Amino acid sequence: MASFSGDETAPFFGFLGAAAALVFSCMGAAYGTAKSGVGVASMGVMRPELVMKSIVPVVMAGVLGIYGLIIAVIISTGINPKAKSYYLFDGYAHLSSGLACGLAGLSAGMAIGIVGDAGVRANAQQPKLFVGMILILIFAEALALYGLIVGIILSSRAGQSRAD
């Protein structure tokens, strides 16, 4: 039997954080891609020349999944209870890191999807709205970036609970 140093339930919370980061971020990316993709498809029937210009919300929504992947990889590389002690503090730090990034990605994906859908449809009617749509999408994407930054900070706190 291998020896284990630390709390035996702590890795569960760490892996749960990695899963939460990836799952929630990908849910946001999927919603944003689907919602804005429907807008692009319906707009493309009327103005097919604007399809490539209107694909921006779909791309921005797809990036959200990458943020969750980054945090999930950071968390999973920090979980190695056989190499060093892994305590509940570490598991909770990784869980909060994953939830911060994942839920921020989910909310950003919802915002990007709704704004992207309405924005590309409105852009077909009035091309001057394109810059405004892009600015709103950037602010929605910033929500996910905030979650990524906080997630990195929280995951770096793991391992600081002990004096060794």
From Swiss-Prot:
It holds the Pfam family ATP-synt_C. The record marks 141 as: Essential for proton translocation. Residues 1-9, 76-94, 155-164 are lumenal. It comes from the Eukaryota. One of its GO terms (cellular component) is vacuolar membrane. The keyword Transport applies. The chain crosses the membrane at residues 10-32, 55-75, 95-116, 129-154. Proton-conducting pore forming subunit of the membrane integral V0 complex of vacuolar ATPase. V-ATPase is responsible for acidifying a variety of intracellular compartments in eukaryotic cells. V-ATPase is a heteromultimeric enzyme composed of a peripheral catalytic V1 complex (main components: subunits A, B, C, D, E, and F) attached to an integral membrane V0 proton pore complex (main component: the proteolipid protein; which is present as a hexamer that forms the proton-conducting pore). This is V-type proton ATPase 16 kDa proteolipid subunit. It comes from Vigna radiata var. radiata (Mung bean).
